[in-house]
Amino acid sequence: MESEKKEENAPNNEAAPTLKTKEDNMAKINNSIKENNGIKEFDLLFLIDATGSMGDYIRAAKEESENISTKLRTSYPEYNFQYGYVFYRDPIDSKSDIHEVINLTDNVNSLPEKIGKIKAQGGGDLPEDWVGAFKLANESISWRNGIKSIMHLADAGAHGKEFTLSDKYPEESAKLKDELMKCAKKNIKIFGYIIAEDARNSFNKCQELYKSYGGSYEICEFPKKEKKRYARREYKAESIDDEECCCDEDMDCNEREECYGDKDEDEDEDEEDDLNERFRDRVLDNVESML
């Protein structure tokens, strides 16, 4: 009798399930239910350079997140879409820089607020930390077994001697190759959005490597629309002679209101709308090409 009591009071050496374990188990159950109901899975990860020059694209990602989700959900009800974000900077060269991750989720209503907290800032030299970005995509994102895609937006290339013309960190090349190979093994299709020429060489090299690893990689031209210049053919006031104007033909002028009249106050808003629309349409086209 005494031995039975000892057994009852003996400590349980099995570790209590952690919150992460419970969440993983629940995810497996939910995925099993979806499979039995014929629901297909599509995981879409945005990999976005979040250094100082990329504010317009972060804003577009925030403002179009729900529009993209609504369109895909209504057009393809047989799919369960999840969306995630990796916002990367350049801690390799600027030690105060950090990367920020929003894991895959189908709770799209929460995305605008989360993305709205991301600030375009940082960046040291011209190349950025593509290695860190893809490492997070491989290690910090909860990919499912369905269709997987990365949409990578950048206006600057990667560190590493094979990816940029001049760099202080040539050893990054081997690291980036390793991360790309891991993505290819996961069967992730990558779309590379070239925003500026500075990034072209890196995107081209990544595409070449990724295809050699058996992966699918498509390059998309996605330049930022240039702002209108205050040339006299557009804004010149009729009462001012060419000789008296303070600006040359194709020169921006701090005194343009005196020379050319005021800028259309709706112009900035129109440019934002144009970028949002192009971003939304390009993402939808890329996703639909995989369905």
Task: Identify the residue ranges that each predicted region occupies.
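Divalent cation-coordinating acidic motifs and surrounding scaffolds
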Residues: E2-E8, E14-D248, E258-Y260, D264, ...
